[in-house]
Structure formats: C-alpha cells, structure tokens
Amino acid sequence: MRDKRLIILIFIPFVFGYLTNLVFLVPGVGTLTYSLMPFVLLIYWFWVGIQFSKSSIKNVYALIYGNILCVLSLLLYYWQFILLGDEKRSMFLASISQMYVSPLSPITARFGIMLEKLPNVITQTSILAMNIIGTILLVITFFAGFIFEKIKHSRLEKVEIDGK
C-alpha cells in the first residue's frame, strides 16, 4: 500500500506547475509565489526521493519510476514543440508538457537566456534549454534525496550493529 502512494507523489509537480501558472496572474501574490515555487518544488522533490528510498522497490527501479514523468514530460515537450509544426500541435499536450518543470522557471530561465544572442529575448532554443535544465535539476534533486536516505539508513544500521 505504501508503494502505491508513491504514484501519487510523482504527479504532484504537475499540480505545482498548474498552480504556479494560475497564481502568477494574481497581482502581488503571483510574483511572490513565482519566486518561492522553485524552492518549494525542489524541497518537495528531495523529500520524494527520500520516500522512494524507503520503499520496497529495488533501487534502480525506484530511481526510474520516480523520474519517469519528469523525463516523459521533456520528451512530450520535444515532440510537441520541436518535431511537430504549429498546425499539428495539441494545445493540451503542449501545456501539460511544460507543467512539470515550469515552477523552476526563475532558476532555469537564467541559464536558458545565456543561449540567446540578444539580451532579454526568449526563443524556442532558450525554452527547450530551460526544460532540459529543469529536468536535470529535478533528477539530481531526487537522486540526492534518495542517496541521503540510503546513507542515513546505513549509518543507523551500523550504529545498531555496533551497539549490540
């Protein structure tokens, strides 16, 4: 039962993304939310990594399952915005593909803009870079939480063994 709860946890970044985009339109609150959301999402994703580490799922599978939606979102984005033309693009799939990493925009935009020739210009290149960087950031954060818990657990086991 506990492992089934993990499925719900990996869908929550979509909710973060939706709320970030929704609240961004509210004066005052939107700017604050937009600024804080990357840190909230990264702390949450670190915690999700910890939860997957505690699960009964084998380590490799836990790392894959925990990050599968993040990677699939990036692939969906690539398909919708790079491979398909504007006339064939699904607005629903196009928006969903960005929700997973959109809360990280205040961080990833700083790197994506570096790829532009003109200052303060955002093109498809910088947006794709933002999505790739966001995905990498989430995978690393998840992995950090996962490893943190494994190390903590192994130290506790060592203390218990030494204490007996």
Give, region by region, the residue ranges found by the protein language model.
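Short, highly charged, low-complexity non-transmembrane loops/tails of multi-pass membrane proteins
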Residues: 152-164
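Hydrophobic cores of alpha-helical transmembrane segments in multi-pass inner/ER membrane proteins
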Residues: 40-47, 135-147
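Transmembrane alpha-helical insertion/packing segments
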Residues: 1-48
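Canonical alpha-helical transmembrane segments
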Residues: 38-66
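Juxtamembrane "helix-exit" motif on the non-cytosolic side of transmembrane helices
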Residues: 18-29, 51-54, 77-87
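Individual transmembrane alpha-helix segments
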Residues: 115-140
